[in-house]
């Protein structure tokens, strides 16, 4: 899936569920933006109702536009576990993200995981981003194999300090 990229910055963030991987990615995106770097890509936050996860959204980083990716009890033909993929919504957001890639300095993905890789439009977007030579920051599901680059394993114990280590590494690599 990933073509060899010799010079591109590749940062992968992984760890168990709930340790703060998405929070760290959003922190990094915010700090890069503050340093005048344009970031494109997407993230897929979970949606909870009464403390229970009911689905996932997909959000374009550049425009902050989002829509449902997968939801419990939704009509549709593609099921992933207890969630139904809302293909039209996912496709609309992936098209927005694809249109922003060429304008970006840095690309970001949250997450490269089993669910995202089972959805054809998301899988194609992930492959497009991974094969791009621009710097990349990606959240990697704990079951996915490393893809080269630098890998940071996030834990509850290190999440507050490691985000600065990752940021410093990225900024020094971009300068």
UniProtKB/Swiss-Prot annotation:
CDD domains: RecA-like_Thep1. This is Nucleoside-triphosphatase THEP1. Belongs to the THEP1 NTPase family. SMART domains: AAA. It catalyses: a ribonucleoside 5'-triphosphate + H2O = a ribonucleoside 5'-diphosphate + phosphate + H(+). It is an enzyme of class 3 (hydrolase). ATP binds at residues 15-22, 106-113. Has nucleotide phosphatase activity towards ATP, GTP, CTP, TTP and UTP. May hydrolyze nucleoside diphosphates with lower efficiency. It holds the Pfam family NTPase_1. The keyword Nucleotide-binding applies. Keywords: ATP-binding, Hydrolase, Nucleotide-binding. GO terms for molecular function: ATP binding; ATP hydrolysis activity. It comes from Saccharolobus solfataricus (strain ATCC 35092 / DSM 1617 / JCM 11322 / P2). It comes from the Archaea. InterPro entries: AAA+_ATPase, Nuc-triphosphatase_THEP1, P-loop_NTPase. Its EC number is 3.6.1.15.
